[in-house]
Amino acid sequence: MSGDDCVIEAKSARRQGRLSDATALYEEAAESFQAENQLARWAHALRHAAEFAVRAGDSPRGLREAQIVVEYYRSSPPPTLEMANALRVMALAEMAAGENDSAVSHWIEARELYLHAGVADGVLEADRRVAVLAAVA
């Protein structure tokens, strides 16, 4: 299946609540895009795989994939919103793994990028998540 076909199937799985299937399909899409040397699309698909792994309860897998995406973006700076979204997924994975200090740092960094990109919902989510983490510290 092509990367594009995998993305279409992953979106369908996500809408149906089949998060583990969505994760696997996004991973397959990422592999396809990487093989085609479409690195921006690879990172984007892998970020989605990471998020759905976390949502499906597999925080180690989500964290591992999110770290790969953030490391790639730090070496090849993407558009601001792509980096903000990658940091958001990284922070979600860290929260799920109990790595709250790292999660706070990544939420703060994502917040600044969302602010710069003019994404008010991203700023609000980051503020809310940092407040929750501060309350449990």
Place the predicted regions along the sequence by residue.
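Residue register of alpha-helical TPR repeats
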Residues: D4, A24, H44, N85, ...
